[in-house]
Amino acid sequence: MSTIRVDVVSTEQSIFSVEAKFVALPGESGELGILRGHTPLITRIRPGSVRIEKADDDEEFVFVAGGYLEIQSDHVTVLADTAIRGHDLDEAKAIEAKKRAEEAMQNRGTDFDLALAQSEFAMAAAQLAAIARFRRKK
């Protein structure tokens, strides 16, 4: 099976680079599946788990906190606001962040405070979902 080059980068650093058979990630309008030869595309991505099926049939998971995706026929670049490899995700921190966001939503002050709390809640929930997905694949 032919492969596609996958680069996952955050605003701080390169997170992951590999030859892969398949990539799945949360696009703005739904889940995207990418194989070599995919139609070129640039789109936003939502917070969630990027699943990379490597050329050696091993899988790698990376949590992204949103960002952009560029697809070329032989290359995929994920430019994430924040990216964390699956094995580096901290469940306790995500649970605590979700709890703080829930409390902030209940004790909201301004509309801005509510929007920020909702955003933090969505991010923590996406991290917990990514952790659950990562555990199922172990």
Swiss-Prot record:
Signal peptide: none annotated. It is a peripheral membrane protein. InterPro entries: ATP_F1_dsu/esu_C_sf, ATP_synth_F1_dsu/esu, ATP_synth_F1_dsu/esu_N, ATP_synth_F1_esu_C, ATPsynth_dsu/esu_N. One of its GO terms (cellular component) is plasma membrane. Pfam families: ATP-synt_DE, ATP-synt_DE_N. GO terms for molecular function: ATP binding; proton-transporting ATP synthase activity, rotational mechanism. Keywords: ATP synthesis, Cell inner membrane, Cell membrane, CF(1), Hydrogen ion transport, Ion transport, Membrane, Transport. Gene3D superfamilies: ATP synthase delta/epsilon subunit, C-terminal domain, F0F1 ATP synthase delta/epsilon subunit, N-terminal. It is found in: Cell inner membrane. It comes from the Bacteria. Belongs to the ATPase epsilon chain family. Produces ATP from ADP in the presence of a proton gradient across the membrane. F-type ATPases have 2 components, CF(1) - the catalytic core - and CF(0) - the membrane proton channel. CF(1) has five subunits: alpha(3), beta(3), gamma(1), delta(1), epsilon(1). CF(0) has three main subunits: a, b and c. HAMAP family: ATP_synth_epsil_bac (MF_00530). This is ATP synthase epsilon chain. It comes from Polynucleobacter necessarius subsp. necessarius (strain STIR1).
